[in-house]
Each structure stands twice: as structure tokens, then as C-alpha cells.
Amino acid sequence: MGFPIPDPYVWDPSFRTFYTAIDDEHKTLFDGIFHLARDDNKDNLGELRRCTGKHFLNEQVMMQASQYAGYDEHKKAHDEFIHQLDHWKGDSNWAKTWLVNHIKTIDFKYKGKI
């Protein structure tokens, strides 16, 4: 079972990881998915892909620097999301659900550890 999808689809404090840079990047991802859901076009998809790649890299660097034990599992989830974006089929509901559940399950595991 997943977490409720916010409507409107915006970041709220329930997604806070307490790492300012990560929270700011998560806000950008929410915005990117919101815009893609409103207008599924190549530009919006490209911008979401760019922001996602940057965020995942930044998060992974933080995890590696702190020798976070859940790094491999976390990176695998990131890789799967990127694969889905690279083979985009226009399912913005899938992207919305993935981000909400990823933050609240996978990302929350590193709170206070990286």
C-alpha cells in the first residue's frame, strides 16, 4: 500500500528529509512531474530527466561519503526510475506515485544517517 498522492501535486512538509539541499531538489522534482502531468511534451520530460539525474547524483554522493549502508538498494531504485523516464509512456500517475512512495519509504531510511 502506498502513501496518499497530494492534490494539488506539490511538495509539503510531510516529505521533509531535514537535508535542505535534498528537500529543495525534491521540490523541483514535484514541480517537474506536475508540469509533465499538465503538458506531456518532450521539453518537460527532458527537464524532469535532467533534474532527476542531478538530484540522484547529489543524493548518491552524500550516501557514499557517509558510507550509508542502504546505498546499493537506493541506487537501484534510482536506476529503475531513470530507466522508466528514458522509456516514457506518458504515465504521469506512475511518476507521481513513485516519487511520493520513494521519498517516504526509501529516502526516509537515510534521515540522520548521511
From Swiss-Prot:
Keyword Transferase: no
Molecular-function GO term, any one: oxygen carrier activity
Amino-acid positions noted as binding Fe cation 1 in the UniProt annotation, renumbered to this chain: H26, H55, E59, D107
Binding-site residues, Fe cation 2: E59, H74, H78, H102, D107
Job of this protein: Hemerythrin is a respiratory protein in blood cells of certain marine worms. The oxygen-binding site in each chain contains two iron atoms.
Organism: Golfingia vulgaris
Family membership noted in the UniProt record: Belongs to the hemerythrin family.
Keyword terms: Iron, Metal-binding, Oxygen transport, Transport
Protein name: Hemerythrin subunit 1
Entry annotated with the keyword Transport: yes
